[in-house]
Regions:
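Active-site phosphate/pyrophosphate- and oxyanion-stabilizing loops and adjacent acidic/basic residues
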Residues: 25-26, 114, 245, 271
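N-terminal cationic-hydrophobic initiation segments that often serve targeting/anchoring roles
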Residues: 10, 28-29, 85, 117, ...
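Conserved strand-to-helix beginnings and helix N-cap segments that scaffold or border functional pockets
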Residues: 21, 50, 106-109, 197-201, ...
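Hydrophobic faces of well-ordered beta-strands that scaffold small-molecule active sites
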Residues: 36-41, 92-94, 125-127, 148-150, ...
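Conserved Radical SAM active-site core
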Residues: 2, 60-188, 192-193, 197-199, ...
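Terminal or standalone catalytic/regulatory effector modules within metabolic enzymes
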Residues: 1-30, 35
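N-terminal pre-triad scaffold of radical SAM enzymes
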Residues: 21-62, 69-93
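Auxiliary Fe-S-binding modules of radical SAM enzymes
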Residues: 1-15, 208-348
């Protein structure tokens, strides 16, 4: 698909959204049927990051009031893995703050991975831990890691506008290291950081070349204290759905995830994202709250979709406790407290 056609999908109002969604859905259905893959994030180490990624509440450039803590214990990580899989997740994602995975962290991860795989040998594990060397990627693969996450976030030309402490090439090299080690790759972008059509198209095509197995499409979450705020003129539900369709057309067999910010930016059109996308997060994001598990699972069921799990969706819905479903105060995202960030331990 040439860039002119891609730009038309994003911008041409004469290409109505419903036919586009149907076309993307036919591709999605061919590869994934009616199945939705649920991922649950574990913010395994929060804050204290020396990178200045302008979109991130953990960055040194952010004044967001997050709950900071060091690496969670092995037992805490294992208990939260159990909880994630018992809530219907097909993939458990451990996310660590910081620039690069040290050898000490690699060794710690290898131990945690081995423990999780003993209990859940058939479940996917994804890790996001900054830059990873070729050797580090090989060691993680041998320890049982299925997938490494490292988002490109935006195009190479736009990258200096969102971060100055590392480069686009640094991120790309980590993805290449993961691929060379035989790991699956999870990499996507963040929409709403001042990028243009060309930047969106560039990321979608770059991920196609990389053969990224999983592609999260994040929508910039408005967190008080962060350098960047969403470019609202470019964040209509219609435009977001067009982006998801484009990613599906260019990456037909990849898992496309409607990721952070779906509740805030898609609003009443949120369920429509499941027609081009086949994956989402349950239980919120790294520091920002998401919709309740009950609401998300109900949305999946009501639209006629199923989840990739041996657990029954109806039974999961019955188990959900009533929760307040509030993700923002009207202008800024609500942040998680320790009760949500560290559910496996008792907090005072």
């Amino acid at each position: 698909m040439d860039n002119v056609t891609c730009a038309r999908i994003l911008s041409d109002a004469s290409l109505e959204i419903l036919p586009l969604l149907d076309a993307a859905y036919q591709v999605r259905k061919h590869y994934f049927g009616q199945e939705v893959r649920v991922h649950i994030l574990n913010n395994a180490q929060n804050g204290h990051c020396q990178e200045d990624c302008h979109y991130c509440a953990q960055a040194k450039s952010s004044t967001a009031e997050i709950e900071e803590y060091g690496m969670k214990s092995d037992e805490e990580m294992l208990q939260e893995a159990r909880t994630a899989y018992n809530k219907g997740a097909s993939c458990y994602c451990m996310v660590y703050a910081g620039r690069q995975a040290s050898q000490a962290r690699i060794d710690r991860l290898k131990r945690i991975l081995a423990q999780i795989k003993v209990e859940f040998p058939d479940k996917e594990i994804c890790v996001s831990t900054g830059f990873v060397t070729n050797q580090g990627a090989v060691e993680l693969k041998q320890a049982g890691l299925d997938r490494l996450n490292h988002n490109l976030n935006t195009s190479e030309s736009h990258y200096p506008n969102i971060c100055t402490t590392h480069t686009f090439a640094d991120r790309l090299n980590t993805l290449l290291a993961a691929k060379s080690a035989g790991l699956k790759v999870c990499s996507g972008m963040i929409v709403g950081m001042g990028e243009g059509y060309a930047d969106i198209i560039d990321v979608a095509k770059r991920l196609r070349v990389l053969k990224a197995e999983s592609i999260p499409v994040n929508l910039l979450v408005p967190i008080e204290g962060n350098v960047l705020s969403p470019q609202e003129s470019n964040m209509s539900p219609d435009f977001i759905l067009r982006i998801l369709c484009l990613f599906r057309f260019l990456n037909p067999s990849s898992e496309i995830r409607v990721a952070a910010g779906r509740e805030l930016h898609l609003r009443s059109m949120e369920v429509m994202a499941l027609y081009p996308a086949n994956s989402l997060f349950l239980q919120g994001y790294l520091n920002a709250k998401g919709s309740s598990n009950a609401r998300t699972l109900r949305m999946i069921k009501d639209a006629g979709f199923s989840i990739k799990s041996e657990l029954d969706l109806d039974e999961l819905l019955k188990e959900q406790a009533p929760q307040q479903d509030l993700v923002s105060d009207g202008s800024k995202a609500l942040l998680k407290g320790l009760k949500e960030l560290r559910p496996a331990i008792q907090t005072k």
